[in-house]
A protein has these predicted regions:
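N-terminal signal-anchor module of multipass membrane proteins
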Residues: 1-71, 75-78, 359, 388, ...
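Long, contiguous internal "core" modules enriched in hydrophobic/ aromatic residues
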Residues: 8-10, 15-16, 22-36, 84-86, ...
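Secondary-structure capping and boundary motifs in well-ordered enzyme cores
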Residues: 34, 50, 63-66, 92-99, ...
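Transmembrane-helix bundle segments that line or gate the permeation/cavity pathway
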Residues: 39-58, 64-162, 177-196
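Peri-membrane helix termini and adjoining interfacial loops of integral membrane proteins
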Residues: 42-46, 117-121, 202-206, 283-291, ...
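Alpha-helical transmembrane segments
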Residues: 76-77, 149-150, 319-322, 390-395
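Hydrophobic alpha-helical transmembrane segments of integral membrane proteins
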Residues: 102-117, 183-189, 268-270, 346-361, ...
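TerminUS-proximal long segments
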Residues: 330-419
């Protein structure tokens, strides 16, 4: 039925099986749609957000997917600026992953602000003293850049290639993609950093506050570093998941190994800076606030084990695996390392958002915990459903992996696949 739309020389499953594959993701979108409608019609009282937790599950998801989507700008930087041409075998996938992450985050923010029809106030009545203003501008601009980078991939569709104007336009866009890659690096550096800097300047909350390096708190640089360390691992996970489901080889091992190696060394470098920053915080910010480390975890469900889990289990262990060639060449160890790395960055964002707000700032105040409502989970999980749908449709109808045909030439007649 849709054979004319499928890339030439590759096999895809039947439309019926593909539709069956999309049903759970459509279900998540439906859940999210009902949740969003309730939040827009009845207000944010549908959530458990309050004056204590002005930031909650949605912001954790936002910061996590924005960090995991950093594989798009960083891989673009390596491919078009540094000249790692072997990464062209995976660059299309990273662009789509980045687009999914950023568009999903922006959609979630549209509900989070409570009155999305006033979202333009962020730009028209900009608070130039707020890091969130810079974040809003850069995220919106970078989403536009990702849309432009996604466009030539769409125009490579087999049917669209028959239209001469589309074919030439897409071809010309490819020639200037380095300009958009450089623009994306610039925009991403500042909004990734400002998301961290926003917490570093919360001086009334010693758990998050950090010393400044020139005009930026150290969290500015740590958020950038952690994003570029985890982003490539998320790209690897998405690629390996697609290979497992489609039962095809989609990307050469050399490309995956290069990304894993770079990610491992970046993660190790980030951990060195993170540990130095944490020790400086323990010796400086904490005692200057009249506190000790144990005071932050005196009560409540959030313990020091979260920091141990983030730095040791989800930091040092995957860094070691990714830096050792024999370890990362084992697919099971590679996937474990990438999972731990991505989990670590989610934990990092959770610690800075939820744990920071759960710790009282007054000696007579209590410790808090946060439990999201089903509406909050619905909107957050809808982003996952949206991402799975868009990536599945892109894989089915676009040449997402340029060497798929070459890598599977001998196996074109086998296997069932949901795409």
């Amino acid at each position: 039925m849709d054979e004319a739309l499928i890339p030439k020389g590759v096999k895809r499953t039947s439309p019926a099986k593909f539709l069956l594959w999309t049903l759970p993701w459509l279900g998540l979108l439906a859940w999210g749609g009902v949740s969003a409608l309730l939040c827009l019609l009845l207000g944010l009282n549908q959530t458990n957000m309050s004056n204590i937790f002005a930031f909650a599950l949605w912001i954790v998801f936002d910061l996590a997917v924005i960090a995991l989507g950093a594989g798009a700008f960083f891989t673009g930087f390596l491919t078009y600026i540094i000249g790692k041409k072997e990464l062209k075998d995976i660059i299309n996938a990273t662009v789509i992953i980045g687009f999914i992450c950023y568009s999903g985050a922006v959609a979630m923010l549209g509900i989070d602000i409570g009155q999305p029809i006033r979202g333009w106030f962020i730009f028209w009545h900009a608070n130039v003293h707020s890091m969130l203003t810079e974040v809003s501008f850069c995220i919106t601009a970078y989403l536009a850049v990702l849309g432009i980078e996604y466009l030539p991939i769409i125009l490579e569709n087999r049917k669209l290639q028959e239209i001469r104007e589309f074919r030439l336009f897409g071809h010309n866009l490819h020639h200037i993609m380095a300009v958009f890659a450089a623009t994306g690096v610039f925009l991403s550096f500042f909004h990734q950093g400002s998301l961290g800097g926003m917490f570093g300047v919360m001086y009334a909350r010693p758990f998050a506050a950090r010393w400044e390096f020139y005009i930026w708190p150290t969290t500015f640089f740590l958020f950038v570093f952690s994003a570029i360390a985890a982003g490539p691992c998320f790209t690897i996970l998405c690629t390996k998941l697609t290979e497992a489901i489609s039962r095809k080889k989609l990307v050469p091992d050399g490309t995956i190994q290069l990304l894993a190696k770079i990610s491992g060394w970046l993660l190790a470098s980030y951990l060195v800076l993170k540990i130095i920053d944490t020790m400086g915080w323990l010796q400086g910010i904490v005692p200057s606030a009249g506190l000790t480390f144990s005071d932050f975890f005196r009560e409540g469900p959030y313990g020091a084990w979260l920091l141990f889990l983030e730095i040791i289990v989800c930091g040092i262990i995957p860094a070691v695996i990714l830096m050792i060639p024999q370890a990362r060449q084992n697919e099971k160890w590679l996937i474990l390392a990438c999972l731990l790395n991505c989990t670590g960055i989610v934990l990092n964002r959770f610690n800075f958002i939820v744990v920071t707000l759960a710790i009282p700032v007054m000696p007579f105040a209590r410790f808090w915990s946060y439990l999201p409502t089903w509406q909050e989970w619905g909107i957050a999980l809808a982003v996952i459903g949206y991402g799975m749908l868009l990536f599945s449709v892109s894989y089915r109808y676009l040449p997402l992996f340029p060497r798929e045909r070459e890598l599977n030439a001998a196996n074109m007649q086998r296997i069932w696949q949901p795409f």
